[in-house]
A protein has these predicted regions:
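Conserved beta-loop-beta element that borders a ligand/cofactor-binding pocket
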Residues: 126-136
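Short, well-ordered, mixed-charge alpha-helical segments that flank or form enzyme active sites
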Residues: 111-116, 138-142
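Glycine-rich phosphate/pyrophosphate-binding loop and the adjoining helix
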Residues: 135-153
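N-terminal catalytic or cofactor-binding beta/alpha core of small enzyme domains
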Residues: 1-113, 119-127, 147, 151-153
Length: 153
């Protein structure tokens, strides 16, 4: 999946730790070089600070229990300031739709771990980051995880 900010040479996929966390399953399915964040505010900040490789693009997967076989692409994170991704998220949305993956764009970030991680990642990686909320393990089919994995390889 080309997220376009020039030529993408290396993409880091990030999920959250947890045995039954769909974001960790998806991140690992996409890339062996994936990273899993700790499920606490202080832990995820330490994890993000420890990332010292340069990536052209970062894709963060988070969970939204209200989603079912659809994803929500977050345009922004809000903490002390509202930070926006510079990636072409409209194009990403169209590419996912063309692959039969239901999705929608949002500018209203949640105020939980995913938003916090997204905000820190946007600042660390020059806003070349996207947060994609996916369904929880209870609301996501294996087929849907496989289609998402293929889309982001």
């Amino acid at each position: 999946m080309n997220l376009e900010v020039g030529t993408i040479n290396s993409t880091l996929c990030i999920g959250f730790k947890g045995k039954n966390n769909a974001s960790s399953i998806l991140a690992k399915n996409i890339s062996e070089d994936s990273c899993l964040l700790t499920n606490s505010f202080s832990g995820l900040q330490r994890d993000i600070e420890a990332l010292n490789f340069y990536y052209d693009c970062v894709v963060l997967f988070g969970i939204d229990k209200s989603l079912k076989d659809a994803v929500r692409i977050e345009k922004a994170a809000e903490k002390e300031t509202k930070e926006f991704s510079v990636l072409n998220l409209e194009k990403l949305s169209a590419q996912l739709a063309a692959l039969g993956i239901s999705n929608y764009l949002s500018e209203n970030p949640t105020q939980y771990l995913c938003n916090d991680a997204y905000w820190h990642l946007l600042r660390k990686f020059n806003r070349k980051v996207v947060l994609i909320h996916i369904p929880s393990i209870r609301n996501i089919s294996e087929n849907f995880i496989n289609r998402l994995s293929i889309a982001f390889r």
